[in-house]
Amino acid sequence: MTSDALKADPNRLIKIIASLSSTRELLSPEVTKADALEIRLDLITEPIDDALHSLRTSFQGPMVLTVRSSDEGGAYAGGSAGLWKKLEPYIGLVDIIDLEIRFKDHAPQVKEHNKAIIASCHQNRMPDDDEMQALIEELHSFGDIVKIAVQPQTKEDVIRLLKITAACPYPIIMSVTGTVYRYARPLLCLFGSLYTYCYIHSETSPGQYSLREMQLLAHLLSPGFVDPWFEGRPVRSGDASGYYERAEQYRKHLEF
């Protein structure tokens, strides 16, 4: 098992995990535009066996299996034993298991299946620096990748979160909860967060950007990189001439 299962591509600063919450999304052609996929078992209510097997065959990137608890923004209200019963049937079809800090006792079982672990914690508040550092260390103690989502209350909190992310010595996915400071989601990737989570049809967390929106942001914020989605389009990161040319064309078209 490798701890860099979600290692970021150095050619693009923002990489995208599409969070899938329905069979419809598992079968969507849009999944091919994501760098990695998250299967939200706590939100999916239909049978997914066939769809997940098909997705595993067709999708080449990492796949994450998640059962998010209701205490951390998900729909799972059961205990530790029930969590493993939900995970076990599908663990062979994915590369990574997301384990919340409350379920860290399952880490040895995940390791026995030779899967990487995203050790996660989601809080609707902004911890102080000491709390954040202690949380990072605890998550790292059982996970290959640390994942933290918190809720900044001020712009200063956002700046502090960027600094903590940049200074983290471990592989980390840092995110924010809520809509007020949702712009921090792509920015955190510029400061060392491996990935940002997006949706295809339905948000799995308030404040998420859609996959298409994040593709645009990834293009604009990764200097010198042209996402395949933009092939054939005139705009390149750092070059605004295409915008001006297109705007002039529109103005002429609208003249009466």
UniProtKB/Swiss-Prot annotation:
It comes from the Archaea. GO terms for biological process: 3,4-dihydroxybenzoate biosynthetic process; amino acid biosynthetic process; aromatic amino acid family biosynthetic process; chorismate biosynthetic process. The keyword Transcription does not apply. 3-dehydroquinate binds at residues 19, 38-40, 68, 185, 204, 208. GO terms for molecular function: 3-dehydroquinate dehydratase activity. The keyword Manganese does not apply. The active site is at residues 122, 147. Its EC number is 4.2.1.10. It catalyses: 3-dehydroquinate = 3-dehydroshikimate + H2O. Keywords: Amino-acid biosynthesis, Aromatic amino acid biosynthesis, Lyase, Schiff base. Pfam families: DHquinase_I (PF01487). SUPFAM superfamilies: Aldolase. InterPro entries: Aldolase_TIM, DHquinase_I, Type-I_3-dehydroquinase. Pathway: Metabolic intermediate biosynthesis; chorismate biosynthesis; chorismate from D-erythrose 4-phosphate and phosphoenolpyruvate: step 3/7. Belongs to the type-I 3-dehydroquinase family. Homodimer. Involved in the third step of the chorismate pathway, which leads to the biosynthesis of aromatic amino acids. Catalyzes the cis-dehydration of 3-dehydroquinate (DHQ) and introduces the first double bond of the aromatic ring to yield 3-dehydroshikimate. This is 3-dehydroquinate dehydratase. It comes from Methanospirillum hungatei JF-1 (strain ATCC 27890 / DSM 864 / NBRC 100397 / JF-1). The gene is aroD.
